[in-house]
Amino acid sequence: MTVYLDSFFSRLKTERLPWRGFSWGSVENEMVGMRDEFGSFSNPISNDPKYIFLIPLISRAKAKDWIVVCQLLKVTLEALVSQSNPNWKAIICGQNSPDFELNDCRVEFLKFQDHEPTTNKFDKFEKLEQCIQHIKETHPADGFLHVLDADDVLHKEFVSFVLRHPNLNVFIINKGFMLAPGGRNGRYLAPRDVTKFRLVSDTLADSCGSCMSCYFDTREGGLEFKLFHALAKQSHGWFEHLAILLGRPLVQVPFPALIYNVLHGNNDYGGRVQPPQLSVEHVKYISDNFTTL
């Protein structure tokens, strides 16, 4: 019963509209059905867990502006290079390599093997699966997988925080910023404070898919990539309560740790408008902690 209550209260804080927390469907039933399986993996976390970013890159043919795509990716990678803890690796998977040198040995480009090439096909998850197969073949170990969109920017202490607090489950970034070009307009995104009446909740996880780190373990007896596969294709606003139902409750990153860039012309839905001006405190926080902005 505690698991169900924890899931419910998680949804009250994180669902954009609170009454959605009362809904229950096939996805929730599926997670509950897998809980016993996820409780059967007992390998302890290693002394040197790997942190691997998976970056699916849109094709040149599908991109609205390939030059902008590459510029944004470069900023994303610069934020990784600026991490205070250097123990990470990034795998970029796409049809086309970016138009700049990948001059850090921790960053690898993986040519996407597209068996049914079409310009408009949604191929993000195929690219992620190719990355995972590559990890199976080249990185037999345990650690964390983090899907990072090629236009999002991480706080410089993020990797350090995760590797200082390793656990066998999931990390979630629920606090961060939506940021428009120029760095002055945006929104602070965070869970609803249940002690205050606020109808709409804008969490980072609800807005941005780059919000989750999943533990993996390819050692003998390990859970392999099962946790990632159970969660990654679900709505990213649901990662938190679904992980609870799996019996793998996540760890909240306690500080605003991600910037979700908008209005650059390559990831926007129709009708998105310029967000309001950020407070002076938020602009300073971004300047102090996101070293490439």
Predicted features and spans:
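C-terminal catalytic/acceptor-binding lobe
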Residues: 3-35, 44-48, 217, 221-293
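Hydrophobic targeting segments
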Residues: 49-57, 79-80, 88-92
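Short, acidic, metal-binding catalytic loop of nucleotide-sugar glycosyltransferases
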Residues: 69-87
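Short beta-strand-to-loop acidic/aromatic patch adjacent to the donor-nucleotide binding site
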Residues: 139-153
